[in-house]
Amino acid sequence: MIYGLGTDICDIRRIRASLERHGERFAQRILSDAELATWTARSARWPDRGVSYLATRFSAKEAFSKAIGLGMRMPMTWRHCEIANAASGKPEIVLHGALKDWFDARQLTAHVTVSDETDYAASFCVVEKK
């Protein structure tokens, strides 16, 4: 049974501007430790891909927060929601801490998709009750 749906579109230029204003602190606020390691590696080699990576993660977390009906309120936090990739490349949501406990207590499962182009990143999330 569908519990919730969420979608988000993110202007990559806004993410780039935030990075220019706040530096790495902005990424540290949004990304989990694992995501931050990936972002750092991509940014060092291909700065534009690093910005796109951050934008897709931002967008996916926004879509997820809408699908669970909390928005960006506790227990939903940027760093407790991680967008990982399966070996196939498929994006997967990995939760941590109080958010994981909250999600598991409700017997929910989530599916997410992300896409990006030159100026925009978009995400769609479906949350189901098991």
Swiss-Prot record:
Pfam families: ACPS (PF01648). It is an enzyme of class 2 (transferase). Disulfide bonds: none annotated. Its EC number is 2.7.8.7. Mg(2+) binds at residues 8, 62. Its cofactor is Mg(2+). It catalyses: apo-[ACP] + CoA = holo-[ACP] + adenosine 3',5'-bisphosphate + H(+). Transmembrane segments: none annotated. It is found in: Cytoplasm. GO terms for biological process: fatty acid biosynthetic process. It comes from the Bacteria. One of its GO terms (cellular component) is cytoplasm. NCBIfam families: acpS (TIGR00516), pantethn_trn (TIGR00556). Transfers the 4'-phosphopantetheine moiety from coenzyme A to a Ser of acyl-carrier-protein. This is Holo-[acyl-carrier-protein] synthase.
